[in-house]
């Protein structure tokens, strides 16, 4: 395919997305440029909505289900409201790859009919619109994963019988639970970057500051949910791709350990690579929404349908135990302990991130919890291991899928195109090195029992999600803050904290990080002004119930302190 032809094919696909939006929902007047209007959330997008649509779309997933499962709100009304707001969101920041609003409204009508006939909801997600990253196959809906060469194919394969008929396991389970599926969101081609850019929709911008990135690779999910065009959605994460967009868009997002949420039947990059597995998790404006979706999916027993899913049901007893620890801490009878890592020894953080961590630390101290400085095994080792995983095939996967159309590669994309694939022996050695690093980190975590004062190791770790807030395009410096979690296969959540403020977040040119001087440190307070700032809550492997419970508790407390210090 020539340069002109792949561009035309991408443009045609881009136009088809807009054409799928009903005319009544298309913006008649052009949106002011980002230099004149950075923030298109809240009042800006609300001007195109009715009061009823605003009420529905600014309600979180838990409260929506409380309404739809009792018949107070119809599934159709809720679905139409989110379809409208999603259509607006796409026209503001380029966040959608696929819209199937008509099919969604048809499904919602069937749900309303079911409720009218049976006086009971279909499932725990009855009537809840759920958005999906464009890796999940949905019947009669295309999956491009950002590749021009995947348009009108099944994962790049022409005349594949699965085209239009295949559904990912998670999609099947969401339907069983009563969720209404209505759109798929933008991703970067290859998935290998902390920004979202491809040759179909171009760049997905940050709704709070349209001069900045929405993150990646689940950047479309982050942007859509930030604009409340979705109450909750599912992304994937191999190096930070759930947590980065969540943090960049002032949202919660969980990266669970591998095997808890079914990946069966989803498209992927580097498919078959198993040294560091990509995982699926939800993104939402509230921690309790994550818990709702996570618990609901596990209730479908995914281990019966996905050979890599663990037979590990939702553990209410862990939630209860964690809540008891929280109550004891409130009463002064006991305390929780947290590590705080402000700098990983590789990428010094910008002032908004440093301030966000100070807010978190002060919140923990106000609540009476123990806080210790985190001194783990070298994170540079984890970054090196992850880099080897990303380049394991020497760029074969990347070159093949870009080569289907001959399209150009975005400069942000990680990975080599001209490497040598690793041999079986080299992959084995990499797996051993990863295991040894995991053991070192495990031993260090255990050793913190000697300094917490609780007799236990730390309950969780707080650290940055990235060196910066929502980033300037093509300036994402390091995935080290999120990537080490993937190497360890730990549970991790993004928690929103505050927003960058050019009047507050300033720094002298000679200021050091943890007493060390660093040569490279680029920060422009004006450019980052208004950018969302999130932090990362990290737990040990398979601690999803505990971390979600802590996130719900601490997220509210952190938000309170951030508001008081604003």
Predicted regions and their residues:
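Short glycine/serine-rich loop segments
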Residues: 168, 172-298, 490-496, 534
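Glycine/threonine-rich flexible loop motifs
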Residues: 142-161, 350-351, 470-476
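Short helix-loop capping/hinge segments that flank enzyme active sites or metal/cofactor-binding pockets
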Residues: 42-52, 126-152, 211, 327-341, ...
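Residue-level signal for inorganic ion chemistry
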Residues: 82, 104, 290, 338, ...
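Conserved small-residue hinge/capping positions at short loops/turns
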Residues: 114, 118-145, 180-187, 364
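An N-terminal boundary/leader segment
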Residues: 1-113, 362, 366-369, 560-566
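Glycine-rich, small-residue loops and helix-cap segments
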Residues: 71, 127, 133, 176, ...
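A short helix-breaking turn/cap at a secondary-structure junction
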Residues: 44, 255-355, 404-408, 560-566
């Amino acid at each position: 395919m020539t340069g002109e032809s792949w561009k035309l094919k991408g443009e045609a696909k881009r136009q088809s997305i807009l054409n799928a939006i009903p005319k009544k929902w298309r913006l008649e007047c052009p949106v002011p440029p980002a230099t004149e209007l950075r923030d298109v959330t809240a009042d800006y997008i609300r001007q195109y909505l009715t009061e009823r649509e605003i009420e529905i779309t600014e309600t979180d997933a838990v409260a929506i289900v409380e309404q739809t499962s009792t018949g107070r709100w119809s599934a159709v009304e809720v679905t139409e409201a989110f379809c409208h707001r999603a259509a607006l969101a796409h026209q503001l920041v380029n966040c959608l790859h696929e819209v199937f609003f008509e099919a969604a409204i048809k499904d919602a009508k069937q749900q309303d009919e079911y409720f009218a006939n049976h006086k009971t909801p279909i499932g725990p997600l009855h009537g809840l619109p759920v958005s999906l990253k464009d890796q999940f196959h949905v019947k009669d809906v295309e999956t491009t994963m950002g590749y021009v060469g995947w348009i009108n194919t099944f994962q790049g394969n022409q005349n594949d019988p699965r085209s239009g008929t295949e559904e990912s396991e998670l999609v099947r389970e969401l339907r069983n639970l009563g969720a209404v599926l209505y759109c798929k969101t933008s991703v970067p081609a290859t998935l290998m970057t902390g920004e979202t850019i491809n040759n179909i929709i171009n760049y997905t911008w940050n709704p709070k500051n349209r001069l900045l990135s929405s993150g990646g690779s689940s950047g479309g999910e982050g942007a859509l949910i930030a604009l409340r065009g979705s109450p909750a959605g599912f992304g994937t994460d191999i190096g930070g791709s759930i947590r980065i967009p969540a943090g960049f868009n002032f949202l919660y997002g969980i990266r669970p350990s591998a095997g808890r949420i079914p990946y069966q039947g989803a498209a992927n990059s580097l498919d078959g690579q198993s040294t560091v597995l990509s995982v699926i998790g939800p993104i939402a404006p509230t921690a309790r929404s994550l818990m709702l979706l996570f618990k609901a999916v596990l209730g479908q027993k995914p281990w019966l349908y996905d050979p890599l899913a663990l037979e590990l049901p939702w553990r209410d007893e862990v939630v209860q135990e964690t809540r008891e620890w929280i109550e004891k801490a409130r009463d002064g009878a006991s305390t929780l302990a947290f590590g705080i890592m402000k700098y990983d020894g590789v990428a010094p953080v910008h002032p908004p991130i440093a301030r966000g961590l100070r807010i978190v630390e002060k919140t923990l101290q106000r609540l009476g919890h123990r806080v210790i400085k985190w001194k783990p095994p070298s994170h540079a080792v984890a970054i090196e291991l992850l880099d080897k995983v990303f380049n394991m095939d020497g760029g074969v996967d990347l070159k093949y899928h870009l080569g289907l159309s001959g399209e150009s590669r975005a400069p942000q994309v990680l990975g080599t195109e001209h490497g040598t694939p690793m041999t079986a022996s080299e992959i084995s050695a990499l797996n051993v090195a990863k295991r040894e690093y995991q053991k070192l980190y495990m031993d260090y975590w255990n050793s913190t029992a000697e300094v917490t004062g609780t007799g236990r190791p730390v309950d969780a770790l707080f650290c940055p999600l990235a060196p910066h807030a929502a980033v300037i395009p093509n300036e994402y410096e390091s995935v080290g803050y999120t990537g080490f979690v993937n190497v360890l296969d730990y549970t991790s959540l993004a928690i929103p904290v505050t927003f960058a403020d050019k009047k507050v977040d300033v720094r002298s040119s000679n200021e050091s990080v943890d007493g060390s001087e660093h040569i490279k440190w680029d920060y422009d307070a004006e450019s980052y002004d208004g950018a969302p700032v999130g932090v990362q809550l990290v737990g040990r492997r398979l601690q999803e119930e505990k971390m979600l419970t802590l996130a719900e508790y601490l997220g509210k407390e952190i938000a309170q302190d951030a508001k008081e210090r604003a």
